[in-house]
Amino acid sequence: MTKKRRNNGRAKKGRGHVQPIRCTNLARCVPKDKAIKKFVS
């Protein structure tokens, strides 16, 4: 399989689980480390 990026677009690493956050310009629930901080409401 191709792998887009090594960290899957997240800042997690050794953490195992991060709580989702209501995120970005869309009202989607996204893991806290994956949400682009610019748009976080």
Swiss-Prot record:
Keywords: Cytoplasm, Endoplasmic reticulum, Ribonucleoprotein, Ribosomal protein. Transmembrane segments: none annotated. GO terms for cellular component: cytoplasmic side of rough endoplasmic reticulum membrane; cytosolic small ribosomal subunit; ribosome. The keyword Ribosomal protein applies. It is found in: Cytoplasm, Cytosol; Cytoplasm; Rough endoplasmic reticulum. Component of the 40S small ribosomal subunit. This is Small ribosomal subunit protein eS26. It comes from Neovison vison (American mink).
